[in-house]
Amino acid sequence: MLKLFSAFRKDKIWDFDGGIHPPEMKTQSNGTPLRQVPLAPRFVIPLKQHIGAEGELCVSVGDRVLRGQALTRGRGRMLPVHAPTSGTVIAIAPHSTAHPSALAELSVIIDADGEDRWIEREGWSDYRAHSREALIERIHQYGVAGLGGAGFPTGVKLQGGGDKITTLIINAAECEPYITADDRLMQDCAAQIVEGIRILAHILQPREVLIGIEDNKPQAISMLRAVLADAHDISLRVIPTKYPSGGAKQLTQILTEKQVPHGGRSSDIGVLMQNVGTAYAVKRAVVDGEPITERVVTLTGEAVSRPGNVWARLGTPVRHLLNDAGFCPSADQMVIMGGPLMGFTLPWLDVPVVKITNCLLAPSVAEMGAPQEEKSCIRCSACADACPADLLPQQLYWFSKGQQHDKATAHHIADCIECGACAWVCPSNIPLVQYFRQEKAEINAIRLEEKRAAEAKARFEARQARLEREKAARLARHKSAAVQPAAKDQDAIAAALARVKEKQAQATQPVVIQAGSQPDNSAVIAAREARKAQARAKQAAHPMADSAIPGDDPSKAAVEAAIARAKARKQEQQAGSEPAEPVDPRKAAVEAAIARAKARKQEQQAGSEPVEAVDPRKAAVEAAIARAKARKQEQQTGSEPAEPIDPRKAAVEAAIARAKARKQEQQAGSEPAEPADPRKAAVAAAIARVQAKKAAQQQVVNED
């Protein structure tokens, strides 16, 4: 009994709320086998044919490409696209694509050369020898995406499933009217589809694999059962025909009774779903080594004379496919990409076929009926009864029309699958799906803007924080530099202080001259040279003009001379009580010679350098003082014995003094001399004469 219940549950199917039963209109195209379409002369390949960002271009204008060659690089969710045939890239520019508004997207335009040459293909016939990651990467790089209409990258979907997938569902329902692409593919390529399903099962390792197919496809069901006759790892489930049983959430509920939560994904309940066309593309990518360059497209409608299903190369213009099917357009002809409920009308026929294109419907005017005027909502709730997602379409309609985005979001407008069942049953002919699409687009735009604003705010706050940190660090560096200078600065400061102290010590140190020793006049000479340099610089900066020296008052000069004579007599009277320092006649002779040389040098410089004005009164006073000193020295010679003088040494020293005098005279022309003071020169000359007389007298005494 338990086995009976288990077997019953194994084949059990469930139902979902809502749904409709529109005319199927599938017999127009599912009766003829798949056929090839002649190559178009030009192909337009949009870079974005899937959910996610477009890939990075890896070709340029003028490049020759082969069929299957990658035109873009795929990283992350960026899925690459490949050349549908061999030819030359003539342009890379925006072109209108498969979109309700025919938006222009960046596309690669290729002129076919007619040879249709493939790249070198490397298939993995023994795919089980490769790792799960390698298989997923190959599927992704070969451009496989969901071919049921969503266009989600298959590799990303498999990678996101991970180890939590317990049920793999293959969607073969194909519930929308007119479309028979999957039906015909299952009839002609059932074995390849099953092989692709096994590759997916090998990657995911689920507990069960289910194929869901509607009961209005008897030929496809029989072909699958024939292929799965000896297989026990894949179960074929035939479900009643009901629209939209092919929806992902609806088919999951039919086969497993599980419902995907609001805002969630099927992987949250351990389910992953793939389309039969996707399974076939996986087989060709892994086993045959062929990127996705073509897909099955249904050409149907009363406006075409040869309806059916064809292998259409991606990038083929819609006009080329319809012309091959015998398209006979009327005056107000429309062409729908997709089905009559979920498709959209093309504004022109130069739009290319992409990976999500499963049908091109060209109905006649009678087939579609006359357009009806939109009326006001009567709140009949027919749309709510038909909604397979358990939503309230009439409320969403009012929220969308009134721009009440928050309320529309709260009523789960994101769960709308845009199946069109509500618009189909609406007695007021309200295009509800169009309102819902526009509302979802506006909500997405608002969220994107909020995200950008949040990112901009985060960047601004991060920048402000960085600037504050840099400012604090800069202030800290300045404070530390002010408190404690660097080692180099400390050394420089210490050296400067040492120099200042040394100069102060030199300035305050007295000059001591010891009798009988040669004084060190280097410091005095250096100071004199410095004063000379300052004087020359001052004269160069501020040249002075010669001016006449006015004469002094004669009465004042006479008074000063009398005062000088009185001082001289007083010094003569004191000569007897104070001992005088003995004078060396040799030194006196030398000093006299040096004084004469300086006098000659000063006379030579008198013509070139201005002479400081001499005060006659001071000169007379100094001369009187000099004579008094001379008399005092003469009086002292008789009281104290003098040191005996060697005449030969005196003669030698006199000769040396004369030689030095000549040398100084010779240097007078090349080196500028310090301006001499005439007063000092006169005093020095008088002292020299007195000392010379004293030396002569002393010599006579010694001879006697």
From Swiss-Prot:
GO terms for cellular component: plasma membrane. It is found in: Cell inner membrane. [4Fe-4S] cluster 1 binds at C377, C380, C383, C426. Pfam families: Complex1_51K, Fer4_7, RnfC_N, SLBB. GO terms for molecular function: 4 iron, 4 sulfur cluster binding; electron transfer activity; metal ion binding. Its main location: membrane. GO terms for biological process: electron transport chain. It is a peripheral membrane protein. [4Fe-4S] cluster 2 binds at C387, C416, C419, C422. Keywords: 4Fe-4S, Cell inner membrane, Cell membrane, Electron transport, Iron, Iron-sulfur, Membrane, Metal-binding, Repeat, Translocase, Transport. InterPro entries: 4Fe4S_Fe-S-bd, 4Fe4S_Fe_S_CS, Ion_transpt_RnfC/RsxC, Nuo51_FMN-bd, Nuo51_FMN-bd_sf, RnfC_N, Soluble_ligand-bd. Binds 2 [4Fe-4S] clusters per subunit. Residues 556-565 have a biased composition (Low complexity). Residues 368-397, 407-436 form the 4Fe-4S ferredoxin-type domain. Its cofactor is [4Fe-4S] cluster. Residues 536-684 are annotated as: Disordered. Its EC number is 7.-.-.-. Belongs to the 4Fe4S bacterial-type ferredoxin family. RnfC subfamily. The complex is composed of six subunits: RsxA, RsxB, RsxC, RsxD, RsxE and RsxG. Part of a membrane-bound complex that couples electron transfer with translocation of ions across the membrane. Required to maintain the reduced state of SoxR. This is Ion-translocating oxidoreductase complex subunit C. The gene is rsxC.
